[in-house]
């Protein structure tokens, strides 16, 4: 094992503090409406310009190993906040630095770090209660647009687009953000269920110009296994032909004789039919087929539950008003499933989302939920250059995730105001505590003003003066850094999602308290690389 360097007590804490401050200084310049951009060099391609705190934090790696430990711990604050709430990463970083710096001063003066930690944790519980008490549910489209606008760095166009997307796909719908191909940012909404499987043969196309197969008022056969022999589906085909309606076959695969016969009948006899592979794999495929069955009001034909393809009747088929298939994807519009059955299935999926511990599984379940009850909205981000597009995409991502958080837990007055309104409650708690626990609560009370002070400083104002003014104001009043005025934050549309504020606080305290209780740090001794050998002389 390689030898290690070890640092103890104050020496260790000062090294960590330097790393924390270095990372925080790079991140906090992005906070607020007048926050600045950070340019990140890339080993390939053009530099990345961003105003997204977590993107900046993720790029920071310090040369000094001990300082880097502090930086990496605060990077974790930003990442965790981004994962949970989707925004608030810069706020979390600013809070973590303020709490750690303030706490370190007290530890240096002889305070017990463990008692400070206990005091801080008690204060967090009080602050979270205060935030929840002040939180307002998001009721109208205007508030959704305002939350998105603030998160997108006051870009009203993005805010409006996200509000429009939520209005169209509903609160359970999915909004995805992709790079566009033009200058304009566009919203594309897909109603109904869409999955990434296309027709199995180009001969199924009904429109050769658009290369689509469009089936109106169609029956849908949903089968769990492969279909190879045509004799398995002949009775069902005859029954469907008699109704004069088209048939869409969704199965694990349609191959060989079955596919060839369907194609020949499509071309020669004008049979209105199309076959497509089922979406997903394994258990997820089975679940998605069941979703399609519920959406279309049909049954999943599965031998596991005793249903055979040869004995399937027309009553067991699903129905859709319209099915649109391209070579890559299928969209089912207006299935005949009952609202009660669809909502019941949606509740099941929501329970699975709550119980799941895997982020990947949660994401896939959320996609299924959106396809079942809402729809999918895609925002195509447009810009003149690739650099601008990446910067804008970061902002749209932030706005979209902040909006989802606002819909989930409600909103608070923004601009750091919500934290200021919690200070009296924390001071009351501190009065009921003793010793270093009391000091821990006082540290939290002082640190809560850090985001507001930073927003003011980024706007070119004196943070302490702005703080003094805001403390004397009414509950919802605060400082609008964009205009330099004191306003009613809710009326002015300066809002923060409660979930974002809460997660930023909880993650900041968690890491800052852990760092405060650190007494020793251990790192590898840096290897000294030998100097390169001198080139061989060329004299003959």
From Swiss-Prot:
Belongs to the chaperonin (HSP60) family. It comes from Protochlamydia amoebophila (strain UWE25). One of its GO terms (biological process) is protein refolding. Together with its co-chaperonin GroES, plays an essential role in assisting protein folding. The GroEL-GroES system forms a nano-cage that allows encapsulation of the non-native substrate proteins and provides a physical environment optimized to promote and accelerate protein folding. This is Chaperonin GroEL 2. It is an enzyme of class 5 (isomerase). The gene is groEL2. One of its GO terms (molecular function) is ATP-dependent protein folding chaperone. NCBIfam families: GroEL, PRK00013.1, PRK12849.1, PRK12850.1, PRK12851.1. InterPro entries: Chaperonin_Cpn60_CS, Cpn60/GroEL, Cpn60/GroEL/TCP-1, GroEL-like_apical_dom_sf, GROEL-like_equatorial_sf, TCP-1-like_intermed_sf. Keywords: ATP-binding, Chaperone, Cytoplasm, Isomerase, Nucleotide-binding. ATP binds at residues 30-33, 51, 87-91, 415, 480-482, 496. Forms a cylinder of 14 subunits composed of two heptameric rings stacked back-to-back. Interacts with the co-chaperonin GroES. The keyword Cell division does not apply.
